[in-house]
C-alpha cells in the first residue's frame, strides 16, 4: 500500500535523508526569509544527497543544529510532541506554517526549538514539508532507521497531519482561485 501525498497520489516509499557537509547560510549575511537568495549551498547539498542515493540532504546551521533540508522544511515527533527547527536559518515555508496550524487544530502540541541530529536519529517520526512534496514521511536519516522498534510509515501523527493536509488542499475554498 502506497503512502498519500498532498496531491492524493500514491508515493512508493518514504524519504531517505543524509546530512550535508554544506551549512545553511547564516541569516546575518543572507536572509533566509528571501526564498531565492543565493541557494548555491542548497544545490551542493542536493548533489551530495544524489551521490549518496538519498532523496534530500539535512542542512545544519552554523552552530550545528538542524535547519532544514536542501529543499524542504523538516519536522520530528518525539513522545507525541511535534518539533520543528526555529525558522531563523531556514525559509519559513507556507506548508510548514499550515502543518503547524493543522497540528494545533487536531490537538498535537507543536514546538519550535533548536534540534540536534541526535534528536532526529532518536525521533519516533520524521517528515518533510514543502509546496511540491506536501508532507513526506522520512524513514532513514544518515542510514539510521527512524524508530527501528516500530518502523511504521507514516507514523500516527504524520498520518493524521497528512490526512488533514490533503483535506485542506482539496477544499475548494482554500487557496487562490485561478480563472482561465
Regions found by a protein language model. Name each.
Residues 1-180:
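Helix-start/capping segments and mature chain N-termini
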Amino acid at each position: 500500500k502506497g503512502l498519500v501525498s498532498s496531491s492524493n497520489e500514491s508515493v512508493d516509499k518514504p524519504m531517505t535523508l543524509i546530512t550535508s557537509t554544506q551549512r545553511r547560510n547564516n541569516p546575518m549575511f543572507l536572509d533566509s526569509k528571501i526564498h531565492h537568495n543565493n541557494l548555491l549551498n542548497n544545490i551542493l547539498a542536493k548533489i551530495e544527497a544524489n551521490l549518496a542515493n538519498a532523496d534530500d540532504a539535512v542542512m545544519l546551521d552554523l552552530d550545528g543544529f538542524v535547519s532544514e533540508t536542501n529543499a524542504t522544511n523538516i519536522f520530528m515527533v518525539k513522545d507525541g510532541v511535534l518539533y520543528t527547527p526555529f525558522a531563523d536559518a531556514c525559509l519559513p515555508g507556507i506548508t510548514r506554517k499550515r502543518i503547524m496550524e493543522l497540528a494545533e487544530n487536531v490537538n498535537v502540541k507543536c514546538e519550535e526549538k533548536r534540534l540536534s541530529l541526535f534528536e532526529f536519529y532518536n525521533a519516533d517520526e520524521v517528515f518533510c514539508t514543502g509546496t511540491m512534496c506536501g508532507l513526506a514521511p522520512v524513514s532513514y536519516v544518515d542510514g539510521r532507521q527512524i524508530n527501528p522498534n516500530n518502523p511504521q510509515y507514516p507514523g500516527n501523527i504524520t498520518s493524521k497531519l497528512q490526512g488533514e493536509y490533503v483535506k485542506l488542499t482539496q477544499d475548494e475554498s482554500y487557496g487562490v482561485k485561478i480563472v482561465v
